Swiss-Prot record:
Belongs to the universal ribosomal protein uL16 family. PANTHER family: 50S/60S RIBOSOMAL PROTEIN L16, LARGE RIBOSOMAL SUBUNIT PROTEIN UL16M. GO terms for molecular function: rRNA binding; structural constituent of ribosome; tRNA binding. Pfam families: Ribosomal_L16 (PF00252). This is Large ribosomal subunit protein uL16. Binds 23S rRNA and is also seen to make contacts with the A and possibly P site tRNAs. GO terms for biological process: translation. It comes from the Bacteria. It comes from Clostridium perfringens (strain 13 / Type A). One of its GO terms (cellular component) is cytosolic large ribosomal subunit.
């Protein structure tokens, strides 16, 4: 499971997700990827499930990059606990995802195989996604 080794603050506020992704919104490493079209929290377990789904499908064919990291702690209080007595303990970690964020990148396989692998991975994720290729970003006006 992905989680930070050390954090500055053990517990953080929930916050809100506004706007589109301004960073991590283009393909940096691979030829294919999946890009979020809605916002949401993706847990470390969901990232791992998607990674396994992709790797099982492509076998030893290509290279996979995970472009998101769960760095936000989510706290929960135990069941049937009265209100008050402080914030709950950290239960799991999430990555905050905004529309436009590239979640996974893949190279070393053909487009048809990459499309199916990303489709399988997208079923494991709580956000809507779309399949993107390097060609899509070159048509839009280049990369950084």
């Amino acid at each position: 499971m992905l989680m930070p080794k050390r954090v500055k603050h053990r517990k953080v506020q929930r916050g809100r997700m506004k706007g589109k992704a301004t960073r991590g919104n283009f393909l940096a490493y691979g030829d294919f990827g999946i890009q979020a079209t809605t916002c949401g929290w993706i847990t470390s377990n969901q990232i791992e499930a998607a990674r396994i789904a992709i790797n099982r499908y492509i076998r030893r064919g290509g290279k996979l990059w995970i472009k998101i990291f769960p760095d936000k702690p989510v706290t929960e209080k135990p069941a049937e606990t009265r209100m008050g007595s402080g914030k709950g303990s950290v239960e799991y970690w999430v990555a905050v995802v905004k529309p436009g964020r590239v979640l996974f990148e893949l190279s070393g396989v053909d487009e048809e195989k990459a499309r199916e692998a990303m489709r399988l991975a997208s079923h494991k994720l709580p956000v809507k996604t779309k399949f993107v290729t390097r060609r899509d970003f070159e048509e839009m006006g280049g990369e950084e």
